[in-house]
From Swiss-Prot:
Biological classification of the source: Eukaryota, Fungi, Dikarya, Ascomycota, Taphrinomycotina
Its membrane topology: Multi-pass membrane protein
Protein's cellular compartments: Endoplasmic reticulum membrane
UniProt GO molecular function: phosphatidate cytidylyltransferase activity
Known pathway: Phospholipid metabolism; CDP-diacylglycerol biosynthesis; CDP-diacylglycerol from sn-glycerol 3-phosphate: step 3/3
Family: Belongs to the CDS family.
Transmembrane region(s): 52-71, 76-98, 110-130, 145-165, 180-199, 245-265, 321-341
Annotated keywords: Endoplasmic reticulum, Lipid biosynthesis, Lipid metabolism, Magnesium, Membrane, Nucleotidyltransferase, Phospholipid biosynthesis, Phospholipid metabolism, Phosphoprotein, Transferase, Transmembrane, Transmembrane helix
Region annotation (Disordered) ranges: 1-37
Catalytic activity from the UniProt record: a 1,2-diacyl-sn-glycero-3-phosphate + CTP + H(+) = a CDP-1,2-diacyl-sn-glycerol + diphosphate
Organism, scientific name: Schizosaccharomyces pombe (strain 972 / ATCC 24843) (Fission yeast)
Protein's UniProt name: Putative phosphatidate cytidylyltransferase
Record InterPro entries: PC_trans (IPR000374), PC_Trfase_euk (IPR016720)
Keyword Lipid biosynthesis applies: yes
Amino acid sequence: MARKRTNKRNNSDKENGNVGVVQNKDSASSKTTEPARLTKHKSLARKPSQNFITRTIWTFLLLGIFFTALAMGHFWVVLLVTIVQIGVYKEVIAIASVPSREKDLPWTRFINWYFLMTTLYYAYGESIYAYFHHLFIMDSFMLPLVLHHRFISFMLYIIGFVLFVASLKKGNYKFQFSQFCWTHMTLLLVVGQSHFMINNLFEGLFWFFVPVCYVVCNDVFAYLCGKMFGKHPLIQVSPKKTVEGFLGGWICTVVIGSLISYVLMHFKYFICPTRDLSTSAFSGLNCTPNSVFLPHTYTIPAVFVDTFRLPETITLAPIYFHLAIFATFSSLIAPFGGFFASGLKRAFKIKDFGASIPGHGGLTDRMDCQFLNGVFVYMYFQSFIAEKSTSVADLLDTAVYSLTTTQQVQLVEDLQNYLISHGKTSVQAICSKLLQNSK
């Protein structure tokens, strides 16, 4: 019995000793893991600050590139927009790509890029014809390309269509047709919409820069107002957006956007349309400003004059009324382009469209609202602001494209007789020489 008791004591001592060893090991391991946890927390604390620094640096770098292009002239802005187009197209196409399948379908990637080049050729050709056709009328090589631009573009597209059908491979039909549809949707939303932004640019830098500026302004102030006052969520697809930020961004965009526009409208380099891509901020532009930039006197209704003790008339440029509409669309409608992009990212379970801009994600993440806003400004400008007039270039365009050689000679003779009858005798020798050369 004594031996059994001593054995039990020894066993209990061993068990207690083992427990002590385990406790010592646990305490030792806890001591070793504490520094690791602290290091991890420090690294997590540093990460947001590093991301903020990277984001800030790239923000100023992008602003520098953008304003440099603006100063260098319209051609460089068009080039910048083209680079953005290609970058966004690449990011969106990459979402639906499946590398393992594309290895078996080597033509898929080529066809995607071929359709992009064909669409760019058509879009830029349309813009060049609309705004710079007078530069190509006298060029015997370029004139046929301008005259038959749409037919050439269509035939280039047909070549791509035939290549796609010829590349169809058994077992991959569904994937290939989904790629075909995805490519055309991307071309419509990216190249199609940015085409109108370039047309805005040719109507005057004002109509390009102001919408871009409004979207950026709304993005910044919607974020700040949401951080300070945000309580009610706005839309499910983008949970961080709030009603307070949405409305606060709109109010701030209307006010600050009007101040920015007030400064820009005093520079003809911004408000004048361009018909020469070699212009820059240093060469300047000269034109008769659009009437929306000129002050108009408006009569205030008597009800408001009596109620609020306002003056009977007010002098104001009509552009401010249009800018209020631009700011409203940029703040309340254009963000839905961003919500559309957010929904697309959630559908494909990705955080960003790419990593081309460190700290910001991809180009698509920054341009999702700009494209939709650019289309609206173009449609609004052409409907309510653009001044329709016939220029010398338009008349020459009609004479070259619509009249036969005999009719063109008759036009010159009639124009000569008209000018001579009005005392412009100096043109007689010039016209006579031209007619002799033509005959």
